[in-house]
């Protein structure tokens, strides 16, 4: 078997990966701090916030497919995805500031409306366009499977590094900026500007391959012919796309539950800065795992086994976190949190490569190139999983009797925090581990190639674009 052609230098991979600094400026700030900002600073009801977020998610499922289709049909000098990545984040920056700049002199109804409009525009329109385009670049700037894994690893190293910093310093940063509503607004402005700069650098650091390099003329003709309905059918008939989407949704739902750590640290551990400590024990092991993921994938000659066994480790780790949490043993909680994060890391690094293989599966079975819409699962997962998770957090907090104006919360609220922060993440990891044990798309592709009598390199060169 001939060696795969390489397309990227190290600085292209690093530049691309830095784009998740911008994505996590939005995502980490929203999932970790939006609820506690709205309840404890603005004074809004957690249950109402949860309902508004849930309603906002109705728009998300529609816009994900729409933007994925639009990217597939875009043809500009910059390429298919880069224009959406660049211009989409301008809207992200503006609406992110809007979410954290709710006027205190408005009545509650107007504040809820302000939040809903800004939050929906941020998630359903601008973040969708930016994130799907950013993810799709993995398939548009290289056809080399190993480079795709490396791009994913660089990407998520930046993602978790950014998430770590935001989770670790935001509470103190808000206080340094004056605290209260003004402090949150100032921090959001600073984060948005940083994200805008880094997103631009990332988009300009890679070059999309030409149509001629990506596919032959026959494939291009097919690509421009499929309709929205056909694209949807291609996706739902690809069982691996469904698996990846469900996994991504559960994973982001998991992130929303871990975001309850802001409340858990403040009201259970009686020290809100402990949230930052837990962030270190989550993100450092994730980054370590990401660094070694490409090497392990190459050594094991595949992704499936690594994802399967590493998530088993993650599941055991979260079970032990729950046990330590109910024991009240913080050092053990931190240690097992690190173990769980170490197990979750490989999937974060090789996920984009799995999606690329999933796209190849669609080409092998349906003979259609749907890379842009295939990567809609990442944005769909972030918004439905993270957004719906945040919504459920709000509803459960309200149901438990939580009141942001109270210094000491009732026992029912404390018990609910234990369930959301300790039990639910373990259950989610268990489900994800089961799905990953069934997600052997590499084997499925190899069997189809053998049946069709198509060489491995020929398929990689012509279909994974």
Go through the PLM ranges and name each one.
Residues 2-464:
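Membrane-embedded alpha-helical bundles of multi-pass transporters/translocases
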